[in-house]
């Protein structure tokens, strides 16, 4: 249905929300949109809220997303990515993505609670 985002430069974060059914082309278009947003900068920690998402990416789609991240490494920079889910299947797919994501760029954690995810994002990196 919709993927929306907001960039909070004061907090140094990108907030992404997926709501309802989303397709791979919608996911990729959303990524292209925030990567070219004038407010986007490398290293923005990201909170991706999938609690209202109905569909999940397939393994090939996750691999495609990881490839986009690798190709845009200079624009994305090193960052933390917190993924918030409410359904077990979404939690599992998010963990799969964490294993596929380029570790040199992303530190990925999956949460069931938005507040815990935000707290992790604001902790100093080791």
Predicted regions and their residues:
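Amphipathic, Lys/Arg-enriched alpha-helical "gate/interface" segment within cytosolic domains
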Residues: 1-126
